[in-house]
């Protein structure tokens, strides 16, 4: 019965769904979601992003589409296309707020209802990947998201951390959450992993080193890679530019493209 419902829904044309999780805020989860979408697009894939970080919807600004409006069609909400080729589509509560600075001051049941509505009522059309950018932590919103997506058999989750022990500790709780909810862990990404000097290419570990990789080994899950601090990446996000296209020689580019390739490989293995 679940499979019949999934085929007839707005997610029926989506081949692979993956969630991006983090144990705490400020680790760059939305940055990884954004750059993963761009990397997959440059691999020839059609990508959707569902931003369910209801209290901190930052992805519309990262694509410089924060002033766009969401329209209705017979099938539901039409997502916002972030590029002329319409290869990346985005849905976020940021498009539904009257003012950009409005705060979402809602209790759990109202948030959970909107998440379920996002899953059911966005007309995505045909997509190769749908990336679901979640709030930090483990809460009712995460449970609602996983339960709403379960009929569509998500590919799995990417966990984002930074090298510090406090962030790595929070990701351990995310691993437990994934285990309890039956969500497959595709791997761990360590973000802000050192700063590579643009002049001499020497890497300085500003925080600490290797926490994400060590956790992945301990938990028995793949380590997808370390993404260094990169001023060009920050600049591209501030200006809504395509980092993957414009900065192929930057220090973060190889790590981000390797992460995307591993996701593509995992999706191919699942399909075969």
From Swiss-Prot:
Its predominant location is cytoplasm
Q: Does the keyword Iron apply?
A: yes
Tell me which domain of life the UniProt entry assigns to the organism this sequence originates from: Eukaryota
Q: Where does ATP bind?
A: 23-30
GO MF, one term, reads:
ATP binding
Transmembrane spans:
none
State the Pfam families in the record.
ParA
Residue positions annotated to bind [4Fe-4S] cluster are 197, 200
CDD domains recorded for this chain? Answer: Mrp_NBP35
How many and how are cofactors bound here?
Answer: Binds 4 [4Fe-4S] clusters per heterotetramer. Contains two stable clusters in the N-termini of NUBP1 and two labile, bridging clusters between subunits of the NUBP1-NUBP2 heterotetramer.
User: Which positions carry the signal peptide feature in this UniProt record?
Assistant: none
- State the needed cofactors, names only: [4Fe-4S] cluster
Metal-binding in keyword set: yes
Q: Please name the Gene3D superfamilies in this protein's record.
A: P-loop containing nucleotide triphosphate hydrolases (3.40.50.300)
- Alphabetized UniProt keyword annotations: 4Fe-4S, ATP-binding, Cytoplasm, Iron, Iron-sulfur, Metal-binding, Nucleotide-binding
Name a single GO biological process: iron-sulfur cluster assembly
Spell out the family assignment given in the record's similarity comment: Belongs to the Mrp/NBP35 ATP-binding proteins family. NUBP2/CFD1 subfamily.
Q: What is this protein called?
A: Cytosolic Fe-S cluster assembly factor NUBP2
Species = Gallus gallus
């Amino acid at each position: 019965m679940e499979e019949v419902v999934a085929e007839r829904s707005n997610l029926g044309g989506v081949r692979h769904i993956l969630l991006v999780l983090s144990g705490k805020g400020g680790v760059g989860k939305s940055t990884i979601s954004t750059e993963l979408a761009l990397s997959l697009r440059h691999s020839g894939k059609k990508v959707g992003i569902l931003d369910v970080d209801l209290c901190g919807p930052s992805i519309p600004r990262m694509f410089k589409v924060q002033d766009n409006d969401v329209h209705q069609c017979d099938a539901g909400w039409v997502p916002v296309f972030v590029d002329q080729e319409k290869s990346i589509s985005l849905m976020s509560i940021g498009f539904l707020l009257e003012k950009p600075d409005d705060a979402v001051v809602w209790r759990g049941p109202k948030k959970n209802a909107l998440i379920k509505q996002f899953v059911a009522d966005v007309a995505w059309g045909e997509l190769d990947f749908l990336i679901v950018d979640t709030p930090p932590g483990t809460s009712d919103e995460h449970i609602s998201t996983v339960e709403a997506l379960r009929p569509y058999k998500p590919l799995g989750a990417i966990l984002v951390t930074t090298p510090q022990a406090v962030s790595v500790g929070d990701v351990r709780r995310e691993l437990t959450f994934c285990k309890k909810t039956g969500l497959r862990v595709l791997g761990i990404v360590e973000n802000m992993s050192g700063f590579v000097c643009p002049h001499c290419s020497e890497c300085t570990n500003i925080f600490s080193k290797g926490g994400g990789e060590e956790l992945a080994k301990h938990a028995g899950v793949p380590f997808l890679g370390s993404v260094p601090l990169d001023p060009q990446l920050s600049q591209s996000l501030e200006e809504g530019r395509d980092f993957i296209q414009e900065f192929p020689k930057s220090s973060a580019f190889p790590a981000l493209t390797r992460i995307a390739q591993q996701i593509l490989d995992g999706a191919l293995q699942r399909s075969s």
